[in-house]
Amino acid sequence: MTSRMPTVVPCLLGPTASGKTAAALALAARRPVEIISVDSALVYREMDIGTAKPTAEERAVAPHHLIDIVDPTDAYSAAQFRADTLRLTAEIHARGRLPLLVGGTMLYYKALTQGLNDLPAADAEVRATLDADAAREGWPALHARLAALDPVTAARLAPNDSQRIQRALEVFMLTGQTMSALLAAPVMQDDSAALWRFVPIALEPSERSVLHARIEKRFDAMLAGGFIDEVVKLRERGDLLPEMASMRCVGYRQVWEYLDGAVDYSTMRDKGVFATRQLCKRQLTWLRSMPERVVVDCCDPHATARVLEAIEALL
């Protein structure tokens, strides 16, 4: 392990619609920056409108990484994110440029900075078996199965939280150990992250209502911009299912329900806005658990300038 001081890497984190992209591009206009996306939805190709993916014009301002890297049928894990980000950070730094992490998937950021528990990779065959069981019995029945095996994990999951129920059962089927036991084990340590000091700059709202209004406006703009047609095209591929991680992304799940005829347009729109606000709430809870973060009020009309000042002070 090298004895040099860790190099500071600024990380611009915040909930959806908090102004991360604008601030990142403003920094790119001042410094030779390469942006590493910290967003579990932006990894998917063919999912542009509903993920608020940076436009071609925005991506031309600075190189962007970890965007459009997997097909919507594929899984992309926090472990993959960590490995990719550590590799990219070193490569960008070696080019004499500034790596800038930007996003709101706090699980990815936690994996990067705190390491990972020794959990197995996703297994397509096991997942297919569990999906078939769920189609036959329903997710509440699989939740009950999980409760018998791992009551600690089951107690913190809703009976219809298909993604996490499936993952907990998958882990048990692959390892013979419960998710709660594996998560309680010591985190695997490595030296690869010790080269860097990842510093979180958090865009947080002083007034939640301001951010909620932005979220509503953004979701309506997505709908006006062709979001439904985007999901129609994804469905027409014929190889995507609503249970897949890509189609569970906020907004896509609600539009899929609408196209199934399960809800009307108005209900779909309201559920999409509500789900985005709930995601925002979870993101803010994660952020506020980081005492080391530098907070910038995203409701401040000069928020972008405040972010630039905070980053420049670190470098």
Swiss-Prot record:
Substrate binds at T16, A17, S18, G19, K20, T21. Keywords: ATP-binding, Magnesium, Nucleotide-binding, Transferase, tRNA processing. It is an enzyme of class 2 (transferase). The record marks T105, R127 as: Interaction with substrate tRNA. One of its GO terms (biological process) is tRNA modification. Gene3D superfamilies: 1.10.20.140, P-loop containing nucleotide triphosphate hydrolases. Its cofactor is Mg(2+). Residues 39-42, 163-167, 248-253 are annotated as: Interaction with substrate tRNA. Its EC number is 2.5.1.75. Catalyzes the transfer of a dimethylallyl group onto the adenine at position 37 in tRNAs that read codons beginning with uridine, leading to the formation of N6-(dimethylallyl)adenosine (i(6)A). Monomer. HAMAP family: IPP_trans. Belongs to the IPP transferase family. This is tRNA dimethylallyltransferase. It comes from Paraburkholderia phytofirmans (strain DSM 17436 / LMG 22146 / PsJN) (Burkholderia phytofirmans).
